[in-house]
Amino acid sequence: MPQLRDSGNHSTAPLDAHTKDEIQSFARIFGIETEYGVSVTGSDRPCDAGQTAMMMFQPIVAEARSTNTYIENGSRLYLDVGSHPEYATAEARDPMDALALDAAGELVMRDLALDAQRRLRSIQGAGSTVHVFKNNVDSAGHSFGCHENYLVRRFVPLKTIEQELLPFLITRQLFTGAGRMGEQGFQITQRADFLDEAVSSATTRSRPMVNTRDEPHADPDAFRRLHVIIGDSNRSQWATMMKLATTHLVLCVIEQAGREGKDSGFARFSFADASAANHKVSRDLTGVEASFDMADGTVMEGGAVAIQERYLEIVERFVGQHPEVCSSLPRTDVHEVIRRWRRVIEAFRSGVSETFADKVDWLAKRRLFDMLRNRAGGRLSVSKLEQLDMDYHDVANGALYASLCRRGAMRTLVNESQAHEAIDVPPHDTRAALRGRFIQSARSHNAQYSCDWTRLSLTSPNRMDVTLLDPFDAQPSDRFLTILEALQ
């Protein structure tokens, strides 16, 4: 949930009863920001990625007079620094809603790319093909990101996040890694070689795993927005849902420990060197062979699986003691999340991780690459495998991922019809519903307007605005209704 402008992140009033209830609950707001890579092949002359991205956004500029806008589902669509189109999902209370919005973003990018491709072919030849990659590393070795956002209670110290959440984020890549083929061979994650700090407020001069820049887009006295940078861009919908849901459950444990002034049980898993641990996890395809130097001076054997087992154990016990956690996610079964989490860990522990190749991106790729190598008698080059790797992530013209889905070799949780619906329909139970309603009304009446995550503004004929500081609140205020009436 990136910020367009300062929109009132500093509260001036005491917490109201509704906000106090939210602080005491386990409810959460989720969001996913995805930067896409762009390239063109088959054209009569070289085509710069930045120019192609601008061509993709020409319809956006024609309508919004900017490369930075919000669409009717409440999500943000914009052209990031350089040549990276970016899509940030609207606020969601549930991982399944965030997943649907993320899938909608893939379709939005595909449509923009294919429209640009049609125009490009009339200029640079019929073979011109626009590729839009939902991955994290381009062919030149440049890295770009997929960032998860979680609304976290303000009373949780940042140091606690670093010590207790980061080991989970690093080791969960067993089932959330997107996989990467390179000259050094195949590894689980795309981002491990590019992240050089554990926690930082910077995003340009360093690449932290968790960003601490304080932009809550909510009441800053009550919440902070946890900006997770370590994750890969997933094509697997199962992996996207699981990374959000399991991280939520770990955060619930951490928050409750903060409320009660107790030990969560996670502190003992803190790494001596998070970056070194991240590299080890990414290169241990078994999930059980790596060993880690811990912050307390000990060495932990058993790889990422051993740490994930401990986190699961604590979460499972916690949910049993706090059944209200189950109602924190409106559309996701917490017990089913725990069952899936246990099964994938057990698969690695038992040496049968390939049974999750229909759910985990890096396992799907490895199975595919191994099969193609065998067909070619082991003579498939690294460059050919890298090409196939890129095709897997191409949401515009890629064939591999779509083929896996059609054949049932990759599990989906949101079908294309549901993803198309999510392009126009925001979640009904967050402030995204109000933003989407405002945008739809303003566009239908050709009104001039602007908005960001916490403010909606009607700019012509009369300037009117409303602040939406509570991301959980989907109920229209009198001020909001007055603005809608002004649009009639």
Swiss-Prot record:
Transmembrane annotation, as ranges: none
EC number: 6.3.1.19
Alphabetized UniProt keyword annotations: ATP-binding, Ligase, Magnesium, Metal-binding, Nucleotide-binding, Ubl conjugation pathway
Magnesium among keywords: yes
Coiled coil: none
Pathway(s) of this molecule: Protein degradation; proteasomal Pup-dependent pathway; Protein modification; protein pupylation
Active site: 80 (proton acceptor)
Signal sequence residues: none
GO BP term, example: protein pupylation
Family statement drawn from the similarity comment of this UniProt entry: Belongs to the Pup ligase/Pup deamidase family. Pup-conjugating enzyme subfamily.
Cross-referenced HAMAP family: Pup_ligase
Note: The reaction mechanism probably proceeds via the activation of Pup by phosphorylation of its C-terminal glutamate, which is then subject to nucleophilic attack by the substrate lysine, resulting in an isopeptide bond and the release of phosphate as a good leaving group.
Protein name as annotated: Pup--protein ligase
